[in-house]
Amino acid sequence: MSSCKPVVVITLLLSMQRLYAADWYVSPDGAATNAGTRQSPWDIGSALGGREEIKAGDTICLLERTYRRRPNELFDVRLKGLADQPIHVRPAPGQRARIDGGLAVQSPSSHVWIHDLEIFVSEPLPDKPVSAGSSPADLKRPWGGLHMHGGTGCKYINLVIHNCNQGISCWKDEIDPEVYGCIIYDNGWVGVDRGHGHCIYTQNDEGVKTISNCIMTCPFDGSYTLHAYGSERAYVNNYLVTDNICYGKGPFLIGGGRPSHGIRVYRNYLHGVGMRIGYSAPYNEDCDVRENVIVNGRLEIANYRKAVQQDNVVLAGNAARPMGAKSILLPNKYDPNRLYLAVYNWGKADTVDVKTGGLLRDGDTVELLDPRNVFGDPVARATCRGDTIRIPVQGEFAAYVLRVSRK
């Protein structure tokens, strides 16, 4: 009987920790010496940097306003949660938190979930192309964005990242992250050689990097929506890339100079964006590429010893189109009132009827938002009738964020 007592005590302690998980508050004019309450908030740097009493299971709430620091615009994140008690970083309920700069996730961060923040750089781009290369001295603006250097089991959920020099960087020492539901647009700059900066630039070896349910578009030729790439000295292994919407400009690449393995690419929806799996490596091991839709672009799979291709739809710009329309409505596993929609409007009709597949009920209403203006006014509104919503579409393709109000 006595051998069971430590188990009971440990279980009780864990239950009490979950019960007493705390909400802490930060604001742009907070201070490290404050109490971390709504009335006496911390500053963002000390809270995210692990210099406060934040424990596994706690939540850091960012009070509404803009968080900005110059120089050193990236706020370090050094927080340690547990797999079953992550630390959450998010806006205070009902508020909008903006980071004019960015975040850098550093070791020993673990099991941190960063939700619903807007990350951007307010300084304008130069009015003419700057010097060639990836680090031009005459660019002269903060880098901004979200940069992952050393977290384990962290999640980056429903972030809006725009007008940075690079949207997301996710490097080899970031283990088992999930990038989910992020809207990434208008990042990068123009050099005299080409466009630079990508929606997501990433490398990986150990663990699996998951990139799912994101909407990505680039403003410049030379930038990539997904740039999972490295030289012969870098690693591009073990990716799960699913249910993303990429359009406009910005090729979708997974591959580099070193052989890759463990590449899985499922149900991505591209328009005006080509997909390339494999780059300059003399050989690659295994990839699984299924159920992707690529319109006005190509699918290239290069130098794989084992490549599974199944149920992909690839239509070049001059290829015959099907009749009618194809719509893809994606649920959001972290926010039931957020949906993403991609529409291939083959017939170029003014409106398209979209089947909701049970994601909406009769009487539910949605606001359709432009992904590049998700905090602005809706493009349109619609009400679900008979498991269907009718939406406006201009041209062959449209992408929307749907904000749902349940009946």
Model-assigned labels for residue ranges:
Residues 385-407:
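C-terminal beta-strand-rich structural cap/linker in extracellular carbohydrate-active enzymes
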Residues 7-15:
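Bacterial N-terminal signal peptides
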Residues 26-64, 68-69:
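Acidic Gly/Asp/Thr-rich repetitive segments characteristic of extracellular carbohydrate-active
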Residues 324-361:
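Carbohydrate-binding surface patches
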Residues 28, 61-74, 78-142, 188:
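Right-handed parallel beta-helix/beta-spiral solenoid domain characteristic of secreted/periplasmic
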Residues 72-77, 100-104, 127-148, 163-172, ...:
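Extracellular beta-strand/beta-solenoid scaffold signature
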Residues 63, 86, 92-93, 110-121, ...:
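Right-handed parallel beta-helix
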